[in-house]
Amino acid sequence: MSTESKLREEICRIGASLYQRGYTVGSAGNISARLDDGWLITPTDACLGMMDPAAVAKVATDGSWVSGDKPSKTLMLHRAIYDNNREAHAVVHTHSTHLVALTLAGVWQPDDVLPPLTPYYVMKVGHIPLIPYHRPGDPAVAARVATLAAQVRGVLLERLGPVVWESSVSRAAFALEELEETAKLWMTMKDTPGFAARAALPDGALTELRDAFQARW
């Protein structure tokens, strides 16, 4: 099986897993992966839970549609990430409930939507900035994310959800899951008296994670 065929299968497998476990619903969300001669990306308005590998769109490095169904309307956003971060080999975007709710309720900080609650959030995710609301597919989002792609592993789109990039489709999905579960934890606990003041890991713990695991915090 060729690398492209394997990536098509992986995109569909990871998409189905995310859908079945409630990280996205309906036809929301998209996944892409880097190829030597372009990218694969899920089709526009496709349900991540029921995709055909042959229908996954192939796009050339110049952005032209090569094969498969029509590419996602967020193609420009995915391309901005790949063009500005050579280590990014996959991008996953979902409309995950707790992360969208977080943008409605108010994020922790604009440059860090969540505090460093757990060691695995610090190790696997790191800083996640908020991108103010724009309509789906707005070029302004791609332009903003292009400036951040090499600095962070993801962003949170206001009212739309997370966009996460990593070295593989599975690693991007794992990071997105860690991000969503941390948002769930924060949304569950943040109104508990005294919690917000002691929620973040102390500076010493963050230094230890940076030294031991090269954590980005």
Curated annotation (Swiss-Prot):
Which SUPFAM superfamilies does this entry report, sorted A to Z?
Answer: AraD/HMP-PK domain-like
**Positions contributing to Zn(2+) binding:** 93, 95
* Active-site residues, Swiss-Prot/TrEMBL: 120 (proton donor)
The Gene Ontology biological process terms listed for this entry are: pentose catabolic process
Q: Does the keyword Zinc apply?
A: yes
Cofactor(s) this protein cannot do without:
Zn(2+)
One GO cellular component term, please give it.
Answer: cytosol
Catalyzed reactions per annotation = 3-dehydro-4-O-phospho-D-erythronate + H(+) = dihydroxyacetone phosphate + CO2; 3-dehydro-4-O-phospho-L-erythronate + H(+) = dihydroxyacetone phosphate + CO2
What does the record's cofactor remark say about binding? Binds 1 zinc ion per subunit.
Instruction: Please describe what happens when the gene is knocked out.
Output: Deletion mutant is unable to use L-threonate or D-erythronate as a carbon source.
Provide the alphabetized UniProt keywords: Carbohydrate metabolism, Lyase, Metal-binding, Zinc
Tell me which domain of life the UniProt entry assigns to the organism this sequence originates from: Bacteria
Enzyme Commission number(s): 4.1.1.104
Primary enzyme class: lyase
Give the record's family classification. Answer: Belongs to the aldolase class II family. AraD/FucA subfamily.
**Described purpose of this protein according to its UniProt entry:** Catalyzes the decarboxylation of 3-oxo-tetronate 4-phosphate to dihydroxyacetone phosphate (DHAP) and CO(2).
What is the recorded name of this protein? 3-oxo-tetronate 4-phosphate decarboxylase
Species in which this protein is naturally found: Cupriavidus necator (strain ATCC 17699 / DSM 428 / KCTC 22496 / NCIMB 10442 / H16 / Stanier 337)
